[in-house]
């Protein structure tokens, strides 16, 4: 692990426009990862445009989420949960989930996953 730590601003990190089946209007920034000294973990920031969404999917790793701004829903195991700035969630490994921005507002959320979960 880095001795110095990391302090930065999201606006200084390049946005990767996500593409693929079930992805609409999603950008990703990798804020902290093993490259910055956080071995085994990755903290990403996702920006979902109004009406956009991540794919409905599951995977073999958990993730922790915190909503930085905006509004939307998190679908987990067949139920939609409202999200707004300050909301947080833990999605266990293997649980089907999807983030959706409101039709009239974007959604920005932090997602922390094990290193192998960042793709």
Residue positions per predicted region:
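Ligand-binding loop in jelly-roll beta-barrel domains
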Residues: 93-119
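Glycine- and acidic-residue-biased ligand/ion/polar-headgroup-sensing regions
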Residues: 62-72, 77
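Conserved short histidine dyad/triad with adjacent acidic residue
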Residues: 44-59, 93
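Short acidic-glycine-tyrosine-enriched beta hairpin
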Residues: 79-93
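Histidine-centered metal-chelating micro-motifs
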Residues: 53-55, 73, 89, 93-99
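Short histidine-centered beta-strand/loop micro-motifs
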Residues: 34, 53-59, 100-102
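A short, N-terminal "cap"/entry segment at the start of jelly-roll beta-barrel domains
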Residues: 1-40
């Amino acid at each position: 692990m880095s001795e110095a730590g990391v302090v930065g601003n999201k606006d200084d990190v390049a946005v990767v426009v996500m593409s693929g089946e079930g992805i609409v209007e999603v950008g990703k920034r990798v804020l902290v990862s093993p490259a910055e000294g956080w071995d085994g973990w990755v903290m990403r920031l996702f920006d979902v445009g109004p009406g956009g969404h991540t794919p409905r999917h599951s995977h073999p790793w958990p993730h922790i989420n915190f909503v930085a701004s905006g509004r939307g829903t998190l679908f987990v195991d067949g139920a939609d949960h409202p999200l707004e700035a300050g909301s947080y969630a833990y999605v266990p490994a293997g649980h089907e989930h999807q983030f959706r921005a409101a039709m009239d507002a974007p959604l920005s959320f932090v997602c922390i996953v094990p290193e192998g979960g960042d793709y």
